[in-house]
């Protein structure tokens, strides 16, 4: 068996690159989804607390007393940002999967005549 033709080598390299990009996007999405879950959980807990209960927010290594409504507003904004980021990452993931499938098909088409 000889060396693979340059076109095949190029497609294999493209597939590897797409696979790495896809894995990076999947990892990012999982991280942002975890942040979203944490934020939603914090918002749920804040809803249970009455307005007179002191609320503290972590700032670096210290806790700072904050107004409950300010913390809720900040967490709600973070939640919305995370949701937008997740949608963006999902679209990127979808496009990468499509490109991966197309490139894989091109590679199979190139290799199938050689298989016979």
From Swiss-Prot:
Cite the Pfam families for this sequence. Prefoldin_2
Keywords for this protein:
Chaperone, Cytoplasm
Gene3D superfamilies given in the database record = 1.10.287.370
Q: InterPro entries in the record, alphabetically?
A: PFD_beta-like (IPR002777), PfdB (IPR012713), Prefoldin (IPR009053)
> Mainly localized where?
cytoplasm
Which subcellular locations apply to this protein?
Cytoplasm
Q: Name one GO cellular component term.
A: cytoplasm
| Keyword Chaperone on entry | yes
The record describes the protein's role as: Molecular chaperone capable of stabilizing a range of proteins. Seems to fulfill an ATP-independent, HSP70-like function in archaeal de novo protein folding.
Family (UniProt): Belongs to the prefoldin subunit beta family.
User: Which NCBIfam families does this one have?
Assistant: gimC_beta
Q: What is this protein called?
A: Prefoldin subunit beta
Q: Which organism is it from?
A: Archaeoglobus fulgidus (strain ATCC 49558 / DSM 4304 / JCM 9628 / NBRC 100126 / VC-16)
Q: Which gene encodes it?
A: pfdB
């Amino acid at each position: 068996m000889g060396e693979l033709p340059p076109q095949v080598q190029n497609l294999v390299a493209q597939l590897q690159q797409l696979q790495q990009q896809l894995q990076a996007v999947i990892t990012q999405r999982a991280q942002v989804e975890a942040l979203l879950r944490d934020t939603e959980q914090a918002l749920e807990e804040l809803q249970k607390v009455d307005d007179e209960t002191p609320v503290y927010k972590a700032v670096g290594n210290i806790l700072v007393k904050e107004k409950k409504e300010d913390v809720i507003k900040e967490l709600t904004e973070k939640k919305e940002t995370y949701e937008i980021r997740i949608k963006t990452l999902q679209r990127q993931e979808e496009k990468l999967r499509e490109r991966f499938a197309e490139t894989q098909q091109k590679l199979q088409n190139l290799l199938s005549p050689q298989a016979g």
